[in-house]
Amino acid sequence: MRVAVSVDLDAIACYYRIHGLGEPPDELDHVILERALPRAAALFAARDIAVTWFVVGKDIDGSLAGPGRDQRVANGQRLAELATRGDELGNHSYSHFYELARLDPVTIDREIATCDRVLAKLVKVVKGFRAPGYDVSPAMLDSLARHGYRYDSSIFPAPGYYAAKAAVMAGLAAAGRPSGAVLTDPRALAAPPEPYRPAMTSPWRRGQAPLVELPIAVTPWTRVPAIGTTLLVAPT
């Protein structure tokens, strides 16, 4: 059986946002790419596993002036080294807006295209995209197709995860800490769990799109998600 391993390189600020914690301390701005990435990369390399790293463009954009520029340049260099090793760098949008799928087509295209330009300084071709929050829209597919992407990996057909996420978000809201996360389009919960060509106007259905949808992995029948969160809470 062939297995694809991918990691979303969301900054700590993304996790603060989804848990309603406000903004993190400045010293944590680059902790994922400075500390976690090298450790994870070493773990995979020791097992001879090639990985797809989905990158948020602004975290490696050396053209941005101001505080953190040196760290952003260094972050890009680390990822370029991993690409040289054989890993893949994927597009995870430029700003990681959780509500990206609900924004207008111009903003969606700008987020995809700007991250693509940043990544193009590190690798020759960017083939894949994953939407923030696993929420994809027809406008996203249209942008990806126009930019020549070969696959999207955003559909998450896991009803149990959706229900748990909705419950957590409701609990945070009741506690006065509204989450910055969004719930995905519920139609995605019934999407095929295996790779398929989506319909351009309905990404959760089979169709004739020029790119392939690689859904987030779930188990057969029960559709339990095979993601890091599940592994952390699963019995040892």
Predicted regions and their residues:
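Active-site beta->alpha N-cap acidic-glycine motif
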Residues: 1-85, 130
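A cross-domain feature marking catalytic cores of carbohydrate-active enzymes
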Residues: 7-9, 53-57, 91-93, 130-133, ...
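Short, hinge-like loop/turn segments at secondary-structure boundaries
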Residues: 23, 80-83, 107-109, 145-147, ...
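CE4/NodB-like, metal-dependent polysaccharide N-deacetylase domain
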Residues: 41-50, 105-137, 142-145, 149, ...
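Short low-complexity, flexible loop/linker segments enriched in glycine and/or proline
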Residues: 67-70, 78, 104-107, 166-171, ...
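A short acidic, helix-capping loop that chelates divalent metal ions and anchors anionic groups
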Residues: 97-102
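Active-site-adjacent pocket scaffolds in enzyme catalytic domains
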Residues: 131-236
